[in-house]
């Protein structure tokens, strides 16, 4: 459960190291969506997706499996005020633009997670951005340009915790 049910295993955001909750009390929704030939757009709102595990069924499953729903494992109080992810697809070009709107209830540390399966990612710290390049064995390439209004720290790791 620390991987497939945990936000750490997905290309998403951690808030002070905390992951999205499990259960119906944590949820996201899609307020806008458009699909066209030249451009497609959607925005997902995950503002209510973070917090402690409180659903009785998941508390019981955690107990039975030995899963610890603790801050050290990524589950704690919600410090998130807003998380909206905008995704734009430019026709059939293979180009996607992802823009995250993030706001904390207080000053928080944001962790933007990117995962790769086959080959390690490469990271470049440039003056106004961080550029992350991922490749696969079939010559596929993905490039992420990360921009932030605050100072950033980067790390490439091969573990979830």
Predicted region positions:
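Beta-strand-rich recognition/accessory modules
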Residues: 78-80, 155-161
